[in-house]
Amino acid sequence: MFKSTLNIAVAIVCSSLVTLTGCEPKVAQSQVIQPLETPIVIEHNLGQTVISNRPQRVAALDMNEVDFLDQLNVPIAGMVKDFVPHFLEKYKNTPDISDLGAIVQPNMEKIYALKPDLVLMTPLHANQYEELSKLAPTVHFDIDFRNSHGHHVDIIKQHVIDLGEIFNKQTLAQKKVAEIDAKVDEVQALTAERSEKALVVMHNNGSFSSFGIESRYGFVFDVLGVKPASTEIAASLHGQPISSEFINQANPDILYIIDRTAVMEGKPVIDAEHLANPLLRQTKAWKNGKVIFVDADAWYITSASITSLKIVIDDIIKGYQS
């Protein structure tokens, strides 16, 4: 009797702590299988996924997926942990969430050991789709990391809706979609009235790559309304290598810089003060104080989730502020 009373008391205390620390990561717990009255069918680019039970042990193989689950308050059983953005840092060192390896190459042995009942993956893991599907229902996030021109934001919103249905979080999912719409409307209203042209470039160990309309960051131009300073850049995951002369000739009004090296090394590497390049300093962007060092975690590690999209939009807005 004493032991039972003690357990109840401990449970009440733990419950209170969780309430007070609402930012704690959601960790999957072993629960009774919950069959669905009607199976959920998710159509995606790699096929069709049928979900017959409410998932309770979810494996997330990408930081975008971790953010979706976090925003929908869905517990996570396992995730890749090699590059965790600052806004998901609470998950990195949580021992009850299994480390499934690297984003680019998850550890299949650890995924098997986890025994997930749902796997969330992206095009980076397309080659593992068949194998993963034999282990558990596997949903492919149809985002295009090479060319986001077209339906980037719509794909994000649809994925939120799909996950809301899978986890019985439909109302919260609709709320998150409304938040995305409001943020997109905010930046579109701003860019529609402005004539400034911008370049999006990535810094990597002293070199630069540029991203155009049909690139990884194409949605910045075709959805969010930023006017490109150059249309000569082809579709690419890592951008087209460019020189300082290219940036100088494009002469953007706004220059957005993604510091990939900062992500890889875990600390900022460059800033405007230390970017001692005379050609860059001749651009309108430099002269007018419109060189924006964006949130590299949001732009490079993610950029296709709820939180990261909001951060990307906030970074874009900075380029139009006085």
Curated annotation (Swiss-Prot):
Belongs to the bacterial solute-binding protein 8 family. It comes from Vibrio anguillarum (strain ATCC 68554 / 775). Keywords: Cell inner membrane, Cell membrane, Ion transport, Iron, Iron transport, Lipoprotein, Membrane, Palmitate, Plasmid, Signal, Transport. It comes from the Bacteria. This is Ferric-anguibactin-binding protein FatB. It is found in: Cell inner membrane. Coiled coil: none annotated. A lipid is attached at C23 (N-palmitoyl cysteine). It is a lipid-anchor. Disruption phenotype: Mutants are unable to grow under iron-limiting conditions. The keyword Lipoprotein applies. The gene is fatB. InterPro entries: ABC_transptr_periplasmic_BD, Bact_iron-sidero_bind, FatB. A lipid is attached at C23 (S-diacylglycerol cysteine).
